[in-house]
Amino acid sequence: MKQRLIFVAWNQISRRSAELSKRLGAEYINLGRVDRPTLKRLFNLVVNFFRTYSLFRDRRPEVIFTFHAHPLITLAAAIYKKFNRCQVVADLHSAAYLDHYRFPLKSLNRWVWKKADILLIHNRMSQNYFNQNIPGYSGKLFVLEDPIPAVPVHIRKKYLYGVKGKFVGILVSRFSDDEPVLPFLEQIKEVNNIYIYVTGNYTKARITPDQAEGENYRLTGFLDDDKYWELLAGADFIIALTTREYTLLSAGYEALALEKPLLISDTDTLREYFQENVEYLDRLTGDIGKSMENVIVDLDDYQRNMSQLKQVKNAEWDTKITGLINKIV
């Protein structure tokens, strides 16, 4: 694309934003965020607002993409658009319409969505929710799932120590409130033939160092990108947990990238995307050990399913991104 594109995010890590920027040829700028304490978070939001507007004035983009969880990021784009010729594409995180769509942010969200040219939404279930609960924007909604990430070329399958004779699973986590990691670990204590690595900064869950390793699991803490991909590449299967609807999990896309068997929470949104190609965990009400056994017994079949699904989803995504580009050029 010959237009000047910029993609701005305010978060800690957003593989979606980074990957989407690459595919679009957009300059990607992530200003970060602060979650706690509340006063510091509010101050950070205000600072990021002015930094973002200043970026727009310096770069003079023709198309602005915002990773829209909080409305202030797209407000900066909407104000810039008022005085400059450009298009605004708000990439809506589910928090935008599930967590921040209430007083006092509801009216601000509606105003900036009205000013935006396109509202990217991450899956069809979210599109249905949006149309049913927030009417008036159906003409602006464009469904675009995450691109399946490219695995770094230097990443090789790595032997995972301490797990001889066991099948290895990687539970990908950020220890968010919607991820029932601790109940999961409690339930796998009786499963003898598996070993689980759990990624992510577990200090957010107030886990003590003595709880960071058990007989058949180990919490890795936060890993840099290379070590993270090496861990995933060395696993027999990948696990992703959520109790939250209307979200597709990064771990699911990463499992597709590596063509790894996937155990994932059973939500309508995830079922709509992955169909019958993965093993579903019934929100921890079912038999976790049995679900793992199902994958272990049919590892080759699940891997073949993921390989085929990857081809289908890549082709679908290529068609969608072409459609998006045609809308903004």
Region roles according to the model:
Residues 206-226:
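Nucleotide-activated donor-binding/catalytic signature segment of Leloir-type glycosyltransferases, i.e.
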Residues 237, 261-264:
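Short hydrophobic beta-strand element within catalytic cores of glycosyltransferases
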Residues 233-247:
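Acidic donor-binding loop of glycosyltransferase active sites
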Residues 36-37, 86-103, 117-118, 151:
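A short, histidine- and acid-enriched strand-loop-helix "catalytic/donor-clamping" loop
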Residues 114-141, 148-150, 207:
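A short, active-site helix/loop in glycosyltransferases that binds the activated sugar's phosphate group
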Residues 297-328:
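A charged, aromatic-enriched C-terminal amphipathic alpha-helix characteristic of glycosyltransferases
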Residues 160-179, 197:
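Conserved donor-binding/catalytic core segment of Leloir-type glycosyltransferases
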Residues 53, 79-83, 102-121:
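Membrane-proximal helix-turn-helix segments that form the acceptor-binding/catalytic region
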